[in-house]
Amino acid sequence: MNKTTRVMPAHKHIALVAHDNYKPELLRWVKENKDALQGHFLYATGTTGRILSKETGLAIKSLLSGPMGGDQQLGALISEGKIDMMIFFWDPLNAVPHDPDVKALLRIATVWNVPVAMNRASAKFMISAPQMAEEVSIEIPDYDAYLAERV
């Protein structure tokens, strides 16, 4: 597939997602990194967003709850180039009813070259990277070329 680039702005659009058993862990991480997150635009699936906003005071755009379509909403935002990175504390030991949606979300993040942190260690590396405060060019699929080849 042909590639093109898009520029992530200095003020990133960051998705925050956590399965039920990992919501307290994500909340703890967000509290620890509140100062670093304040300069960015934050999005979250429903329940997670409400908890994080209530407990931290951060402005967070809450989508639907994951099982009710929030994961798919987030995937659509990624496809539209509106999400720059994702922190997703998912539960590797327990299946969730919307596992196909979770897999689709991770797949679409990979397709569009969106950085994803899936645990505290990778989230720490991501949030502390110097590029967090800079514009960053990333390679993405050239959808126009893809469409032209297929039509």
Curated annotation (Swiss-Prot):
| Name of the protein in question | Methylglyoxal synthase
Q: Which GO terms describe its biological process?
A: methylglyoxal biosynthetic process
> Any idea which residues are catalytic in this one?
71 (proton donor/acceptor)
EC no. given is: 4.2.3.3
What keywords is this UniProt entry annotated with? Lyase
Q: Which residues form the MGS-like domain?
A: 6-151
Query: Which residues are noted in the entry as substrate-binding?
Result: 19, 23, 45-48, 65-66, 98
The entry assigns this protein to a family as follows: Belongs to the methylglyoxal synthase family.
Q: Which reaction does it catalyse?
A: dihydroxyacetone phosphate = methylglyoxal + phosphate
GO CC terms in record: cytosol
Q: Which CDD domains match?
A: MGS (cd01422)
Record-level Gene Ontology MF annotations: methylglyoxal synthase activity
HAMAP family reported in the protein's UniProt record: Methylglyoxal_synth (MF_00549)
Q: Which organism is it from?
A: Aliivibrio fischeri (strain MJ11) (Vibrio fischeri)
Checking Pfam families in the record gives:
MGS (PF02142)
Q: Which domain of life is it from?
A: Bacteria
Upper taxonomic classification of the species? Bacteria, Pseudomonadati, Pseudomonadota, Gammaproteobacteria, Vibrionales
Q: What does this protein do?
A: Catalyzes the formation of methylglyoxal from dihydroxyacetone phosphate.
